[in-house]
Amino acid sequence: MEITVEHLGSVQFEIRAGNHSIISDQPTSDGGFDEGMTPPELLLASLGSCAGYYAAQYLRKNKLATEGTRVRVTCEKVKDPLARMTNFVIEVDAPVELSDEHRKGVEEAVEHCLVHNTLLHPPKIALKVAGAVAAKNMK
């Protein structure tokens, strides 16, 4: 998997993956134009959309309605001593009443989400900083 991120000016960045792109920005109170989600919001969006995918797959497999399924993801921001996000909560609201069996099934399905599991088992992250020549080759 690979994405590229390019600075557009001010505090905006274009994020590209394959044929798709989105803009990351900051609120006007932080010098942005508020034209896109912030990086922390994108992390929540990634977790929520992954959870939604797995929830909908479970519902579809069990011949239950999927359209209108909603996922809400919340977290807390802390500084201890580094600023980070913690205490994530994923809430899945199916468009139909669920039996206890199906409620548990949705929960188990969401627990297979790649993003969910990555956050539960943090990966190693390597950081490499390069100069102008390497940056030109990224395009």
Question: Where in the sequence are the language-model features?
Answer:
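Extended beta-strand/beta-hairpin segments
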Residues: M1-A45, A55-K139
